[in-house]
Amino acid sequence: MDIHKNTLVYTAYAVFNVMVAKEVNDLVQEPYMDEPFHIPQAQAYCKGEWDYWDPKLTTPPGLYILSVVLKKVFLFKCTIPILRMNNLLLNLMLPPLISHCLALYRSDRPPRSLIQPTVESIAISAFPIAWFFSFLYYTELGSVVFVLATILAAGRGAHVLAALTGAASCTFRQTNIVWVAYAAAFGILQDMRRRRTRSQVSSDSNEPVLYDPMALDASLSDIPKILSSVPAILPLLINTAWPYVVPVAGFASFVFWNGGIVLGDKSNHAPTLHVPQLYYFVAFASLFGFPVLISAETGTMSLIGEVTRRMSGGTSRLITSVALTGLIMISIHWFT
């Protein structure tokens, strides 16, 4: 029986990660960086000490509860290497999840098997920041896994499941509520697009549809058209969006009860409006996504020409670009 090449690559990735994990545990035998806060908390829960809580911890106990579940199911011990292995297992869940998310965004067929993730998804899973925390006991991996599961479920129309996984993601990082909102919007748009496709196929359908032009063809003049199409689809939108009320209401209740977003150590984690963080994200994503952008069929020069045309192709676009640049500079000055 032939083994799919993606399965071989995925197996090699898993074996390599296990080898790295063993090396890390051999060299770093004591809790490292923030692990002195996370590991004792998890070990307390493993002992059934549910009333223990380290006031220095800033995130909810999702990671520690997951460790208790794995301990109960697989009879794991809550030693440092085993707790770190939790994140290694979560890392190995990333390639299948990313493969299915990519297929969803591209409207492609997903891999036939969970052990046949695409090579691209494996490369993304090895992204240095996420990969580094695969060998330590941190909240990053659990947060990413549940966020991806939320986006995938929402995009496929499983909104109740998406709301549940979204709520679970917030128990790892409470700020994941932003990703829950993104997943909800993405899932609703996917539903609207599927309805539009059905209405186009069925000539006698009078079902209202959202005005949703292609991003590359859209302009500022399309915004009023999009907004004017919303009232007609509002009942459908509410019917689709209601499951997400649960995590949003839960988050709002938490903030009210806690007196803020950060759970503990509030003196060192005061919330503030930091607009340039969005610019950092765009620059960071553009830098690491540049190889993909320049490898497109149209080529680098076509990309440069298209960006130039959209920024300065005509008086209105040039004025808009200058105005946005000014607003960006003002936001950097006042909100850094």
List where the protein language model places each region.
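Membrane-lumen/periplasm interface segments of specific transmembrane helices
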Residues: 170, 176-336
